[in-house]
Design a protein with these regions (language model features):
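Flexible, acidic/Gly-rich N-terminal and inter-domain linker regions that tether
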Residues: 1-30, 34-38, 42-43, 201-203, ...
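Conserved Radical SAM active-site core
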Residues: 4-11, 23-24, 30, 35-115
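Conserved AdoMet/S-adenosylmethionine-binding subsite of the radical SAM
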Residues: 63, 82-233
Length: 233
């Protein structure tokens, strides 16, 4: 029976992007070679934070949990989920008529069929060119006020005709963040959207404000490398 290393799986709602507010079952796989310095899910890869008990979940059991939740769709995330062969999981979910979304940096070949691809590029391992055209939406993490211009110079987002979300890196806008830096990040997003319009959109991780993921006891606490751990970011 096919198994996958799963850090956590839980029933919640999508807190960002086009599908904001819709019910979703999240499967967070274990492992990530990208190693973003501000990662909010370092428990999936960082040697100082990885749990002793990494679940090896059977595909059939995962699918059963998804179906029982009666969610609108499933989100496979990480870590970096595309380092795993997800073809068995996506096939089994599609047999149950469950739409499959994936959140990825796009740096590795896709193995599996996905109905929605959120591609969030990372400087530490840039996306494969072949994956850019597969994106249903992009998500740029805005670390500082120069981030957007740097990313637009690197990737011609506008040519793909899909939404490009501009998300403040969460620790940069936390209560403990430097106010000048925080204002610079948020202002850069607002000004870019006002100046350039579509496909750019101002984004936010609304689920963190609701603290909704923790309502499911199967959800692990976030392990961030920046921000305020007591508040989950």
């Amino acid at each position: 029976m096919k198994k996958l290393p799963v850090h956590e799986r839980f029933f919640t709602w999508q807190g960002e992007g086009v599908h904001l507010g819709r019910s979703a079952y999240f499967i967070r796989t274990f492992g990530c070679p990208v190693k973003c310095p501000w990662c909010d899910s370092a428990g999936t890869w960082h040697p100082d934070h990885t749990p002793k008990d990494v679940e090896k979940a059977e595909v059939d059991e995962l699918v059963s949990a998804v179906v029982q939740s009666n969610c609108d769709f499933v989100v496979i995330t990480g870590g970096e989920p595309t380092i795993h062969d997800l073809s068995h999981l996506t096939s089994a979910l599609h047999q149950e008529k469950v739409p499959v979304h994936i959140e990825t940096c796009g740096a590795f070949p896709f193995r599996g069929n996905f109905d929605w691809v959120t591609l969030s590029p990372k400087w530490w391992k840039l996306p494969l060119e072949e994956n850019l055209s597969k994106a249903s939406e992009f998500k740029i993490i805005v670390e500082d006020k120069s981030s957007i211009e740097k990313w637009v110079a690197e990737i011609p987002f506008a040519k793909f005709g899909v939404p490009v979300w501009l998300h403040p890196e969460w620790s940069s806008i936390s209560p403990t963040a430097n106010p000048e830096h925080k204002n610079g990040v948020l202002s850069s997003i607002s000004q870019w959207v006002k100046k350039n319009g579509s496909p750019y959109r101002a984004g936010y991780q609304l689920h963190k404000l609701y603290d909704v993921d923790r309502l499911d006891p199967n959800s692990r606490s976030l392990v961030p490398l920046g921000g305020d751990p007591s508040r989950g970011y």
